[in-house]
Amino acid sequence: MSLGNTTVVTTTVRNATPSLTLDAGTIERFLAHSHRRRYPTRTDVFRPGDPAGTLYYVISGSVSIIAEEDDDRELVLGYFGSGEFVGEMGLFIESDTREVILRTRTQCELAEISYERLQQLFQTSLSPDAPRILYAIGVQLSKRLLDTTRKASRLAFLDVTDRIVRTLHDLSKEPEAMSHPQGTQLRVSRQELARLVGCSREMAGRVLKKLQADGLLHARGKTVVLYGTR
């Protein structure tokens, strides 16, 4: 379909990421002991300096983990969706306060349980499920370490254009990405893209214009169609 001023796009949402290595029964038993809470879009669930004593599990929606500098600049460290744990480091490394921001990207439902309570349950009613839950958390930690290593390498060795191209391709694999007749449709603002790659909003906008002129994508507002990624 045309990408002009009157574009109408028929889209289908990609399948959500399945809960890593956890079966439905294990999830249900874990959730039975957790407090479920709903959060609006763009809500900070916790910020640096907040007490660190809770494990979160994303039931629905999408969240971002963000590092914040003293001058209020932000760098997005990762996006996490349904079936993923957040704040899991506290199960293994004792820390009194949070060091990053957990912010909702969409309306979310999160399950929350204190580390102390979960450790007690691992010795009692959740004892049979403890190996599976801990293994799932280990898988997620390993994946996030690989993602962080890749992001650090990009910051060190790639220019802004290459970082943005690779980040857009990463976003095309996220559950929120939608199929499009010419590739993949993403919803990401210049500000969000800048936070993902570590540059200014203005620089992100200039790079998108260049990539559009080169025929690699079409960008309008917060909508980006990345060509050739179906």
From Swiss-Prot:
A nucleoside 3',5'-cyclic phosphate binds at residues 18-139. InterPro entries: cNMP-bd_dom, cNMP-bd_dom_sf, Env_Response_Regulators, HTH_CRP, RmlC-like_jellyroll, Tscrpt_reg_HTH_Crp-type_CS, WH-like_DNA-bd_sf, WH_DNA-bd_sf. GO terms for biological process: regulation of DNA-templated transcription. It comes from the Bacteria. It is found in: Cytoplasm. GO terms for molecular function: catalytic activity; cyclic-di-GMP binding; DNA binding; DNA-binding transcription factor activity; protein dimerization activity. Residues 190-209 bind DNA. Allosterically inhibited by cyclic di-GMP (c-di-GMP), which binds to Clp and abolishes its ability to bind its target gene promoter. PROSITE patterns: CNMP_BINDING_3, HTH_CRP_1, HTH_CRP_2. Keywords: Activator, Allosteric enzyme, c-di-GMP, Cytoplasm, DNA-binding, Repressor, Transcription, Transcription regulation, Virulence. Changing V165A: Decrease in DNA-binding. Global transcriptional regulator that regulates virulence factors production by activating or repressing the expression of a large set of genes in diffusible signal factor (DSF) pathway. It includes, among others, genes involved in extracellular polysaccharide (EPS) synthesis, flagellum synthesis, protein and fatty acid metabolism, multidrug resistance, iron uptake or genes encoding extracellular enzymes, membrane components and a few transcription factors. Regulation can be direct or indirect, via regulation of other transcriptional regulators. Not involved in DSF-mediated biofilm dispersal. This is CRP-like protein Clp. It comes from Xanthomonas campestris pv. campestris (strain ATCC 33913 / DSM 3586 / NCPPB 528 / LMG 568 / P 25).
